[in-house]
Amino acid sequence: MDFSKLPKILDEDKESTFGYVHGVSGPVVTACDMAGAAMYELVRVGHSELVGEIIRLEGDMATIQVYEETSGVSVGDPVLRTGKPLSVELGPGIMGAIFDGIQRPLSDISSQTQSIYIPRGVNVSALSRDIKWDFTPCKNLRVGSHITGGDIYGIVSENSLIKHKIMLPPRNRGTVTYIAPPGNYDTSDVVLELEFEGVKEKFTMVQVWPVRQVRPVTEKLPANHPLLTGQRVLDALFPCVQGGTTAIPGAFGCGKTVISQSLSKYSNSDVIIYVGCGERGNEMSEVLRDFPELTMEVDGKVESIMKRTALVANTSNMPVAAREASIYTGITLSEYFRDMGYHVSMMADSTSRWAEALREISGRLAEMPADSGYPAYLGARLASFYERAGRVKCLGNPEREGSVSIVGAVSPPGGDFSDPVTSATLGIVQVFWGLDKKLAQRKHFPSVNWLISYSKYMRALDEYYDKHFTEFVPLRTKAKEILQEEEDLAEIVQLVGKASLAETDKITLEVAKLIKDDFLQQNGYTPYDRFCPFYKTVGMLSNMIAFYDMARRAVETTAQSDNKITWSIIREHMGDILYKLSSMKFKDPLKDGEAKIKSDYAQLLEDMQNAFRSLED
């Protein structure tokens, strides 16, 4: 929000409007003489005017969590009430920017202060007032038109990827008395004036919205379109939908951040909001370094991915209280773009740090701790965040649909999934991508454990698959059966060895190895495999399962005859086919293109059928 417009202590005429600091305990400050203050009201604390939020009221005492470092605040310092809740500014200029947890623009602060640190009590508006944006009003609006909350009244081309639709804030309505002609305006210029019941109100391109409040929608819709991640194991076995909720729990070093970053880079979302919440600063700088170089092709033009991304950085060395706010800031930005009719993905890395911030504040307030010292309301807070996801019919005209998908990384200490944060999260989310330390140690990435992970969106996506990839659902079921069977056989193999297994079981083991090593495993740092389009995923799986079916049939049909076909014979005769199967992943979707990859896979299937025919003859 625009902190420069908030009242300042020096400007106040009456001292009676101040409260006074009564006690300081880390980020928690208690203040007296605060009668009339509201819950979650924004306040300025001390002579440095630090930003804080009231989290408890008792008599005329208020407990405030301060979003900045509180060293130097002393008893008796003034506390100024602003009369507003913690809010964010929504308007052109969000894309490509990097904010801290309470939406202060880090690049602007850095250029103004020439410092690598954020000074305390800094006053900078979240969206720059200097940049001029090219505003085009909607053709069907003129003076005298009626307009209501959520209606789009203008369009700003924020960059070549995002057309920023300027909407009327949800609670306003009236008759247009002025609308700005097409031209260049900054975010403080009035572009619309309305009259309602004799009262005129002016609007700029920016709207302010409280972060803890859900933005209203017309209705929630069932989600039915997959969120394609470009990771084979996720798209094929545990799909998520646009508007879904996903948790990625995993111990340190399992690759949570790499999965969230590859989602940001390659998923089929229109807008990405990446919230780094209490994680390493290096991870955010890596995103800032990598994303501008990464490109995507839109209508034949190559564009930087940074143009569709906004970052909310709240690293582990920033004040603890702001971690809690950063998650709400991120989800409010996501809902704003959803209201324009975009499909938004929000990455929260990691919600465990957010829960730890809740625990620290709760401990300072001397609240009764629950499991592992987390507050009793941990589950409710997590739910209030995850339930803001979903596919919706947006408010206002023209009619449009948008969605917010949330992907939350969870880092349980020691990779223990019975941790309170993980278990509370799993009760809320619909998709669980469980990362396995053992797989990560074997350098099998993405280290998603295919036996414990699940997705509850399978049924919802059946219609989509039937329409576009008819053969896919039975293939997925078969692949899961093979992997499950291999897990059951693993114990027997350890006891008696591979040689004493039945021939069909040997085939199951070999095909499971093929699926694990050459389908589920994916090298995110190579041009051919960092992103796998869905047609390639289906083609690869289809050929592997076809090989499995043919091999089993060949073994079973000749089991009673004199010239038996065993697995060793198949392996001997089909070394070339097996090599081709395991190198299907090396086809580069950008260089080779969809048509060539599909024809290559079809050719491989034909070669396989011919090879099995000649073997049986």
Curated annotation (Swiss-Prot):
Give the UniProt tissue specificity note.
Answer: High expression in the skin.
Localization in the cell: Cytoplasm; Cytoplasm, Cytosol; Cytoplasmic vesicle, Secretory vesicle; Cytoplasmic vesicle, Clathrin-coated vesicle membrane
The Gene Ontology biological process annotation of the record reads: ATP metabolic process; cellular response to increased oxygen levels; endosomal lumen acidification; Golgi lumen acidification; intracellular iron ion homeostasis; intracellular pH reduction; lysosomal lumen acidification; proton transmembrane transport
Q: Which residues carry this modification: Phosphoserine?
A: S384
Q: How is its activity regulated?
A: ATP hydrolysis occurs at the interface between the nucleotide-binding domains of subunits A and B. ATP hydrolysis triggers a conformational change in the subunits D and F, which induces a shift of subunit d. The c-ring is subsequently rotated and results in a continuous proton translocation across the membrane.
Question: Mutating E279Q leads to what result?
Answer: Complete loss of interaction with Rabies virus protein M
Post-translationally, this protein is described as follows, namely: Phosphorylation at Ser-384 by AMPK down-regulates its enzyme activity.
EC number(s) from the headed UniProt entry = 7.1.2.2
Name under which the protein is recorded: V-type proton ATPase catalytic subunit A
